[in-house]
UniProtKB/Swiss-Prot annotation:
Residues 241-300 bind DNA. InterPro entries: DUF3528 (IPR021918), HD (IPR001356), HD_metazoa (IPR020479), Homeobox_CS (IPR017970), Homeodomain-like_sf (IPR009057). It comes from Homo sapiens (Human). Residues 207-217 have a biased composition (Basic and acidic residues). Sequence-specific transcription factor which is part of a developmental regulatory system that provides cells with specific positional identities on the anterior-posterior axis. PANTHER family: HOMEOBOX PROTEIN HOX-A11, HOMEOBOX PROTEIN HOX-A11-RELATED. Disulfide bonds: none annotated. Residues 168-193 have a biased composition (Low complexity). It is found in: Nucleus. One of its GO terms (cellular component) is protein-DNA complex. Residues 154-246 are annotated as: Disordered. GO terms for biological process: anatomical structure morphogenesis; anterior/posterior pattern specification; branching involved in ureteric bud morphogenesis; cartilage development involved in endochondral bone morphogenesis; chondrocyte development; developmental growth; dorsal/ventral pattern formation; embryonic digit morphogenesis. This is Homeobox protein Hox-A11. Keywords: Developmental protein, DNA-binding, Homeobox, Nucleus, Transcription, Transcription regulation.
Length: 313
């Protein structure tokens, strides 16, 4: 429908062929929706014009992150009619720290929160200061306390290096204290005497006995002592992988592998000769050959499965 056909359409405006534009003389009390120049039509709205004007997105972005000075983006004078008296009091409380030297970005973020998210039930310290986590306000600290424990636990968990010491049971702490007392000697005894109880001495003695029992004996044979030490180290540090204990030296393994290459099964004479040459017992040579045969069997089985699964190889 062209523009020149809209004129006679005002009398029968409810017909389907009409575009619902009305002219000024028919309805003189209403503002004209279609002026003479269609390209420049001022749209009038039914609501009042005293609502706060919405700022563009760039201004809101700059104000939220305080990229430019706060005074440029906060028209404080003409927004007073939008908020209740309680929120105005909170805004006055916010303006006081700015005179005391609060950084501009903190003030900008807090004032933006006050202007854009009015809540009647907020308290005055909700937006004024930043909370313990450094990002959210102080009112969110209660959620951090319930999620991560009490404030004391929060303060202690800031340093992960001390977690193992704090998580340790009191028995381990008493054991370490008893070991320190055994190392110092007389001062620890005098302090336990000044504690004034035979129970303290008995506890320290029991802890010292437990510590002594936990230490590996160094008087055993080299092979067993090295194995026990490695087991202890692997048990104490769960992260560290336990080093494999091998009772044979590289020279012994090389000679045994050479003999195994010539014959998988070894007779008694050859076994005695090898044990004398390699400074091993007859039983050690026998067990090594048994283990080596089992290893060879497993290698052959894996090789067979690999080549049967890949027929092109």
């Amino acid at each position: 429908m062209d523009f020149d056909e809209r004129g006679p359409c005002s009398s029968n405006m409810y017909l389907p062929s009409c575009t619902y534009y009305v002219s000024g003389p028919d309805f003189s009390s209403l503002p004209s929706f279609l002026p003479q120049t269609p390209s420049s039509r001022p749209m009038t709205y039914s609501y009042s014009s005293n609502l706060p004007q919405v700022q563009p997105v760039r201004e809101v972005t700059f104000r939220e992150y305080a990229i430019e000075p706060a005074t440029k983006w906060h028209p404080r004078g003409n927004l007073a009619h939008c908020y209740s008296a309680e929120e105005l009091v909170h805004r006055d409380c916010l303006q006081a720290p700015s005179a005391a030297g609060v950084p501009g970005d903190v003030l900008a973020k807090s004032s933006a929160n006050v202007y854009h998210h009015p809540t009647p039930a907020v308290s005055s310290n909700f937006y004024s200061t930043v909370g313990r986590n450094g990002v959210l306000p102080q009112a969110f600290d209660q959620f951090f306390e319930t999620a991560y424990g009490t404030p004391e636990n929060l303060a202690s968990s800031d340093y992960p290096g001390d977690k193992s010491a704090e998580k340790g049971p009191p028995a381990a702490t008493a054991t370490s204290a008893a070991a320190a007392a055994a190392a110092t000697g007389a001062p620890a005894t005098s302090s336990s005497d000044s504690g004034g109880g035979g129970g303290c001495r008995e506890t320290a003695a029991a802890a010292e006995e437990k510590e002594r029992r936990r230490r590996p004996e160094s008087s055993s044979s080299p092979e067993s002592s090295s194995g026990h030490t490695e087991d202890k180290a692997g048990g104490s540090s769960g992260q560290r992988t336990r080093k494999k204990r091998c009772p044979y030296t590289k020279y012994q393994i090389r000679e045994l592998e050479r003999e195994f290459f010539f014959s998988v099964y070894i007779n008694k004479e050859k076994r005695l000769q090898l044990s004398r040459m390699l400074n091993l017992t007859d039983r050690q040579v026998k067990i090594w050959f048994q283990n080596r045969r089992m290893k060879e069997k497993k290698i052959n089985r894996d090789r067979l499965q690999y080549y049967s699964a890949n027929p092109l190889l």
